[in-house]
Every structure is written in structure tokens, then in C-alpha cells.
Amino acid sequence: ADLAYLNEEYLSKFTKTGKVDSVIPVQPAYAKTKEVEAYYPVDAGEDCTAKTYHELSIVVGNATDIKTTMALRLLEGVLLESESSPLRRALLNAGVGQNISGSYVGSLLQPIFSIKASGSEPELRDKFISVIYKTLQDITINGLDKKLLEAALNSTEFKMRESDFGAYPKGLIYGIGVMDNWLYDGNPIEGLRYNIILKELRDGLKTRYYEQLIENYLLDNTHKVIVSLLPQPGKEEADRALEVEKMAKLKA
């Protein structure tokens, strides 16, 4: 009845224009890694020591490739999220930052794998990048610790099978899992069919599957950006003065 009312009173008065184009275009890969340097405001006279941020962000794969998405999420945790993580440990030992972290955003059409250093200095950017590449290259040659991978996979499998999502309702998490694929014209049900994928990921522990992912997506892939965020005393005041000047011109 409600739908009929909406149609009779509103929708029927409009002409159907055809199919809505909701396709999100894929961003072409960069020919080479981009570099960005930006500034954030700190108080005038403030000590800027160890207040620089460096980040390497990499576009990796496609959200509709659920197996690869899950595998890269596992890799991010293994490489960066624990005291035993080899990439995190290498960056801390190299002194490129006081804090090292990572993130993996798999809900975008083109997921993003990020490696971050905070509490750093501007001149440490090149060292930050070189340590990342050297460590990842060493891992692809010598192999990733399969015990770390297996532990991460066991934890993921437990959460999925037991619907253990902490304080979050399982229905909400299932809905998000469905939408991550459905939003980009993938099969929504595939986001819930994890048994086969978990088996394939576990089989990958016996091969170079994870090392190959590192090679293909993190090393040989040029769709990357290096971002350095530096402190700039007095920037807030300068930006405010420019905004006041801009508004004055608009009012004139």
C-alpha cells in the first residue's frame, strides 16, 4: 500500500529516464610512484623534533577479488600489527620513527595497503622507503614466517566461524561483508561463502602464495604514493590571513 501510494502520488508523475549509471571507474595505475610533501600547523616557536609523518600507500587489487583481499588483510597484520611483525620490527630498529603502524582498507573498489611512521624527521623519508623495500625483498627470498601467518589465519577463521566480532552485532558485520562486494557489482553472497577461501588460504601456507602477493602487489606494483607530512610553525595563522584576504576580495 505504501509503495502504491508513493507511485501514484509522486513517482508516476515522472518519466523514467533509463538505467542509472552507478559504475565506479577504475583509476589507472601510475607509471611510477608519486611523492607528496605537505604541512600541518603547529604553534609558533614549538619544537618540531620527531613530529614528521611518513606513509607509503599502495593500491592493491580489486575489492571483488575476495580471496586476494582477505590474504592481503592477513599480510598487513602479520607484517605490521604485532611485536613479532618483521616489517614493523625492521622499521623500528632502523630508527625511522617512534611508532610504526599499518592499515588495509578493503572496502574500496581498489583497496589500499598503507605503511606508516610517526615521530619521524623529514630527512628520514628515503631511509623509511628503503627499509620497507629491502625488508620485503628479503622476505620474498627467504620466506615469510609461516607460524605468524598460520596464527593470523587461525584467528580470522575463529572469528568468522564463531561470529565473534567483539562488541559489534554479527548481523552488522555480515551486512558490511556483503556490501563490500555488492557495491561494485560483485555477487553479494560471495562475501559469506568463506569456507572455500579459508581452505585456499591455508593451502597457500605450503607454497609461495603469500611471498608472491608481496612481490606482485607491494614491490613490483607502481600504483603507489609516498606522503610526508611535516610540521610548520605559524601555518594556521598564515592560512587564516589568506582566508580573510580571500573573503574580503569576494565581498568587494
Positions of PLM-derived features:
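Charge-rich, well-structured scaffold segments of protease-associated domains
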Residues: 1-32, 47-65, 71, 77-252
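Edge strands and adjacent loops of beta-rich recognition modules
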Residues: 41-47
